[in-house]
Amino acid sequence: MVKGVIFDFNGTLFFDNDKHVKAWGAVSRLLRNKDITDEELHKYFNGVPNQKIIQYMKNNQATKEDIDYYSKLKEKYYRQFCKEDQATFHLVEGSYDYFKQLKDQKIPFTIASASIKENIDFFVESFHLDKWMKVDDIIYDNGTYQNKIAMFKDAALKLNVNIKDCLIVEDSKSGIENAYQAGCRQIIVVNSANNKKEYEKMPGVIKVIDDFKELL
C-alpha cells in the first residue's frame, strides 16, 4: 500500500528538456562560439551536473567563479525560455487531478529534484505548487546531497513515511536506479524519453505512463 508519493520534477511533472538544451546552447555559444552537437548532448550533457558540463566546455580550465557564473546564467536562460514558450509552460496533463486524488486519499506527497533553489522557487510560483504541498518539504539541490539516492531518502523522511511504503515517480534511467537503490520498490515512470520497453524491465518499475490521467 502506498503511504506517500515522491515526484521527480523535470521530465516528470514538467516537460522541459528542450529548454535545458536551448539554454546550454546559448552558454556554449558564449564560451566556445559554437552550438552543441547531438553526440555531445548525449555524451556530456544529459543527466550531468552543471559543474561538469561547464568544465567540459572550458576544457577543464574552469575556475570556481566560472562554474558559479555560467551555471547561474544557464538557469537564467532556462527560466527565460520557459516563460517565452507559453504553449508548453504547464504541468503534464492530469498532474493537478492526481494531486487532488492524493489529497482526497490523505496521502502526503512532495518533490525531490536536482534543480537549484532559484528554479524551484520559479516552479512553485509559476505552477502554484504551494497550494498542493508544503514548500519546505520540497527537496532540491542545495549543495549538501551526494546524489539522488540521498534526496529520495530525505524526501521520505520529510513525509514521515518509510521509503519502502513510498511511490516514486521518475522519468530517467538514472532516476529509476537511484529510487530503487534508495529502497523504493514502487516506481512509476513518465515516458517523456519514449523508452517504455526498457523502463518496464527495470527493477522496481510497476507502471510506465505518458501522463497522469492514466493514474486517475
Predicted regions and their residues:
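Conserved SAM-binding loop
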Residues: 13, 109, 168-169
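Short beta->alpha linker loops
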Residues: 19, 45-48, 90-94, 115, ...
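Short, acidic loop-to-helix structural element flanking the phosphoryl-transfer center
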Residues: 80-111, 149
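Short phosphate-binding/catalytic loops that engage adenosine nucleotides
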Residues: 62, 107, 184-185
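N-terminal helical cap/lid subdomain that shapes the substrate entry/recognition surface
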Residues: 2-93
